[in-house]
Amino acid sequence: MPAAKKNSVTSALLGLLGSRRDTPETFDGEEQPAAGEGQLENHLGGDEARNYRQYEYDMVAPHVGKSLLEVGSGLGHFSEQFAGRLDYLVVSDNDAYCVEQLTKRYAGNGDVEVLDLALPAEINIRRKVDTVVMMNVLEHIKDDVQALKDLASVVEPGGRIVIWVPGYMQLYGDFDRKVGHVTRYTPKTLEATVTGAGLGIDVLKPINFLGGIAWWLAVRRGGAGYPDPKLVKIYDRTVVPTTRAIERVVRPPFGQTVFCVARVPE
């Protein structure tokens, strides 16, 4: 690749991720709801980011059964992709606005239950599910082991808890502090959390290798901040497909995200 093109791609990645040096301080001193890197994914959630949304779905979908509890549902855009294959869906959040909107969205739908849920906590749902999905949630919870134990209590024996978390403390920066991240995980630290909750592991690996490199560079420049929406399309069209192509043939040594499928004992 010509040097000029490399520099333009790097600049686009860094602009997408932002930096303390270039981005005004907007933090109001209060932790945001359990959105985590969902703040990034809010920018990657529209039509301009179809590749990224497909990346998430393709990673998670093979592990989703017929009944699903989603933790940290936001407005429900991710779980709605599974609606046609589920006979029971529980959506949840700990943000009052999100819970209100989810309640309105699913009013009158007897196959969907809406919960106001802040883990760790006792979970009361109509029946057990075969799958839990938590996208960018666990990193907000100090007692992450207990949170997984609470979730396991409402999963059928042999069921799965699908976990998507930000990876590697070397990537921890202003963004993480602003959104209330307690930590970023490595496969080793996430394994310790999952096994500490009494769960087995089917899948555990870092993903989004190129995104991890860009995030690291942004932190080195002064702290990863909020994404520049103008560059989301560039990221989606160039970085996401390239990352996916690499990860089809090579297991990356690290990544922006750590992905895990935990198994509830039979």
Label each PLM-derived region with a short phrase.
Residues V145-R160:
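A short glycine-rich, Lys/Arg-flanked "PGG" loop and its adjoining helix->strand segment in the class I
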Residues W216-G223, P253-E266:
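Core SAM-dependent methyltransferase catalytic element
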